[in-house]
Amino acid sequence: MLLHSCQLGPEIGEDISNFVVILILDAALEVFSAYGFRGSTVDQIASRCGLSKPNLLYYFRRKEDIYVAVLERTLDDWLEPLRRIDAAGEPIEELTRYVSAKIRLSRERPEASRLFANEILHGASAIGNFLKGPLKKLVDDKAAVIAGWMAEGKLARID
């Protein structure tokens, strides 16, 4: 590859690496959402993003690593609207903004929705630790915000 034969500054090399990783993850999302984890191959992902298999394996050593990275990126994108719920904000505005963002993400990224749903249906083994750890804490924190709004009379109580 031409890039390896020329002298690049560290920031340019890092930018290229980041670009390639994004390219791989985008291609992997398409492949995994179409064929599932078991039905997908590293060759399919490499072909989809225009890399050779050895070049792809330079960035990710195993198919499992690619799969987990795709799921983590998906979860990070999906959880951002939840993270932005502000306890000091108006409950209806905060919840409306959250729901609108989630609907927009599902509409704009149906492959990610399909991939995540399939992972959950198959037991969530690839992301189980995340679901039990950081995600649980985030959900518990936001549930406490909603409970606080109900205690303050800003939202109706529900059973």
Label the predicted regions.
Residues M1-V20:
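N-terminal intrinsically disordered/low-complexity leader segments
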Residues R107-N129:
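Amphipathic alpha-helical segments used for helix-helix packing
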Residues A69, R83-A112, E152, A156-D159:
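Hydrophobic alpha-helical connector segments
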Residues D76-L79, R83, R104, S125-A151:
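Amphipathic alpha-helical packing segments from all-alpha helical-bundle domains
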Residues S17, L25, Y67, L71, ...:
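Amphipathic, non-transmembrane alpha-helical scaffold segments
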